[in-house]
């Protein structure tokens, strides 16, 4: 049962659909005062290597998801208990900010079998060539882009390389 929950495509497809349909310019009514959101984002920014800034579009997206996708986020929080320790171990080994783990939430809704419309696959949404470049075995029989541990190892190496190129974590 738990394995079925971990690979359910429903939350991935729903989340991708919701992301495409969010109108960042449309004000969403939700019981989250703007000043409280600004304060929380500021505290996050102070503790993070990322640049986290308030803007009205971000507020609308956050409120939209809190209002309309509460059940989906509850499922994501449950699934994260399984995957985040794997991600954190790999990221820590490579001195990568642990916040990068949330990239997998955005990319795949934590579904190791997620496949984008352009063929990116797995938790970290590696394209075929990028997966090969980071030594993931991809064939008719196996696709390590869908292996949580191997894909996380490859994602850590990829993030290291991106940091070397760009010099910051706001990739």
Give residue ranges: language-model regions:
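Substrate-binding clefts and substrate-entry loops adjacent to catalytic sites
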Residues: 61-75, 110-117, 125-168
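Solvent-exposed, polar/charged alpha-helical surfaces in well-ordered, non-transmembrane soluble domains
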Residues: 85, 89, 101, 153-160
């Amino acid at each position: 049962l738990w394995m079925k929950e971990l690979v359910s495509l429903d939350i991935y497809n729903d989340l991708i659909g919701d992301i495409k349909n969010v109108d960042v310019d449309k004000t969403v009514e939700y019981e989250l005062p703007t000043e409280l959101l600004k304060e929380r984002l500021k505290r996050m920014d102070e503790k993070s290597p990322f640049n986290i800034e308030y803007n009205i579009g971000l507020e609308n997206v956050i409120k939209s998801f809190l209002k309309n996708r509460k059940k989906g986020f509850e499922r994501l929080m449950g699934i994260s208990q399984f995957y985040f320790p794997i991600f954190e171990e790999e990221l820590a080994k490579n001195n990568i900010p642990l916040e990068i783990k949330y990239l997998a939430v955005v990319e795949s809704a934590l579904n190791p079998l997620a496949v984008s419309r352009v063929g990116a696959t797995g938790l970290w949404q590696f394209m075929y060539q990028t997966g090969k470049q980071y030594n993931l075995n991809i064939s008719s029989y196996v696709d390590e882009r869908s292996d949580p541990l191997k894909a996380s190892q490859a994602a850590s190496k990829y993030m290291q390389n991106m940091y070397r190129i760009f010099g910051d974590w706001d990739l």
